[in-house]
Regions:
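Conserved "repeat-terminator" motif of extracellular CCP/Sushi domains
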Residues: 1-7, 78-127, 132-133, 205-225
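Short, solvent-exposed loop/edge segments of extracellular or virion-exposed proteins
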Residues: 3-33, 38-42, 74-79, 111-116, ...
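Surface-exposed interfaces of beta-sheet-rich extracellular modules
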Residues: 44-88, 169-207, 257
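Serine/threonine-rich, repeat-prone extracellular segments and beta-strand-based repeat modules
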Residues: 72-98, 199-218, 251-285
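Short, solvent-exposed loop/turn segments enriched in Ser/Thr/Gly
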Residues: 124-127, 237-243, 266-273
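C-terminal edge beta-strand
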Residues: 285-293
Length: 293
């Protein structure tokens, strides 16, 4: 006989040994041997194979997904045939065979660039959108995007385990920078608009990762607030309303000024009055002043 033993990987079900048998016999025409009538000694016929060849047949090795099989240390998928040997005319058992297994290497998953701006298993786009709302203009969006990929130095995005079929993805990094896990949204300075104050003069730079959520920031503009000042005039002379505003030069172009009620300049004295400031967008602000006549 020859026995094929299987050494399976940990966690795998055992594979039963396979025993190969080559049957020999002494039978020749129904006679196994002859006995000497004088001495009584029996002379046996030589052993010979009962049928077939005097060899252990080749045998296919049972395969395990994700592993390479080895026969007595040599990578192979079948146990080779082996001649039966004899010693002093007696057929001998064949050498036992050991089948072992080695796990195959992980299968590379090639990196694919994908579609610009579209997230997938291999690409991640992290975007900050800054929307600038300048007065009298359509909003303008400024996109700041950091592209992250999983591509390694070998052009692969990950590796698939041949046994489980699970893919382990490479860590995210900034596209083109293998060792840079973090990217940056750059600092953004809001446009300066005469007569208006931005809701924020700048948007600070920010470090981001592939897990950072997309963000949208709106920058709006409010007109500069008017500052009132007292006005001096002569009896009978009504001053222009804009004289009651100290910071006209800081206000938006096209701002208009009017008296809420025309001040009484018919007599001397300090007369309370109100200047109505009308911005280009139509909003108004009332500014209390004193008119000295």
């Amino acid at each position: 006989t020859r026995t094929i033993n299987y050494e399976v990987p940990a966690g795998h079900a055992a594979i039963a040994p396979v025993t190969q048998t080559v049957e020999y016999t002494r039978d020749v025409n129904g006679v196994a041997g002859y006995q000497d009538p004088v001495t009584g000694e029996i002379t046996w016929n030589p052993w010979h194979v009962k049928s077939g060849n005097a060899e252990f047949a080749s045998a296919a090795v049972e395969q395990i997904k994700g592993y390479d099989s080895y026969v007595d240390g040599t990578k192979a998928t079948e146990v080779p045939a082996a001649q039966v040997t004899e010693k002093d005319g007696v057929p001998q058992n064949g050498a036992n065979v050991t089948v072992s297994y080695q796990k195959q290497g992980d299968t590379p998953v090639p990196y694919k660039p994908g579609q610009e701006g579209v997230d997938d298993d291999m690409n991640q786009y992290v975007t900050r959108t800054i929307v600038v709302h300048e007065p009298g203009k359509d909003p303008v969006s400024h996109d700041q995007t950091v592209h992250f990929t999983r591509e390694d130095a070998n052009g692969n995005a990950g590796y698939t385990d041949p046994v489980t079929g699970e893919t382990t993805w490479n860590a995210w990094h900034v596209a083109g920078e293998l060792n840079q896990a973090n990217g940056t949204w750059a600092e953004f300075n809001a446009p300066t608009v005469k007569g208006y104050t931005a809701s924020q003069a700048k948007v600070a730079a920010e470090e981001v990762t592939a897990e950072t959520k997309n963000a949208t920031i709106d920058i709006t503009y409010a007109p500069v607030a008017p500052t009132g000042q007292n006005v001096t005039t002569k009896v009978g002379e009504t001053p222009d309303a804009d004289q009651g505003i100290a910071n006209k030069g800081d206000l938006p172009d096209g701002t208009k000024y009017s008296w809420k009620t025309t001040p009484d300049v018919s007599t001397e004295g300090e007369k309370p009055a109100t200047v109505i400031v009308t911005y280009p967008g139509g909003s108004t602000v009332e500014v209390p002043v004193t008119v000295t006549v």
